[in-house]
Amino acid sequence: MTAVAVIGAGAGGAAAVTELTLAGHEVRWWNRSPATIEPFRAAGGVRYEGVFGDGFAAPARFATELPDALDGADLAMVCLPSLAHEAVAGALIAAGVTCAVVLNPGHTGGALHVAEIFRTAGAPPPPLVELSTLTYIARKPSPDAVRITGVASRLRAACLPGGEMGLELLRTLYPAAAPEGDVLATSLANVNLVLHTPGALLSASWVEATGGEGFHEDRGGKRAAPRKATMHAATISFRPDSETPSPRGPQRALR
């Protein structure tokens, strides 16, 4: 059993809490915004559906403060997009993190970016590991639930020098993580950088025709905003959950 501090209460964090809890690991859960994690805390865990079936996963601990989540943790997993990494790195510095930190997902230069934040603050960087993309396709159908429609069957993982033990520990949690020689390989394999833009363009007419209410659950997407849509990691091999119907039913063709 591994003690894992999951940071982030969006769809990715909720999916990680679900899988790691079901696998028997000790999961501590923390989020920067109390409002986002509160529905899960009030419910005592995560209602999940999709590739892991339907059920309820209760983490070992909901942490109100980051040091509480990190206390005794073997690994801290940051399940947040890159725009949050700087703030999370600052919180990890303030909390005095010493365990390995995994960026799930990383971004282009993600581990290098986080290491530089630590050095600039005069703090030694912890062992840093990054993944080339998020390990899940997931969305939150409600504030206290997650729908997981895919799990990566292979993705790239790498660490900065000194993070080798963290990388090996990560691979015990996610055997699909294929180790690379350095973080340049994972950074340059950031498929989201390439895929989100064409996904938004190809979905533009659908999103505009629905007034910003278009969904694409079959791709694990999120509620679309006008003229914007998100498409996740189509070039990664996933275990699709073909049995999960769209809650909105069949979508009509848009002309």
What are the residue ranges of the model-derived segments?
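Rossmann-like NAD(P)(H) cofactor-binding subdomain of soluble oxidoreductases
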Residues: 77, 82-144
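Rossmann-fold dinucleotide-binding core
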Residues: 114-214, 250
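Long, compositionally biased stretches enriched for glycine and/or charged residues
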Residues: 223-229
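Small-residue-rich helix-loop
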Residues: 233, 241, 247-248, 253-255
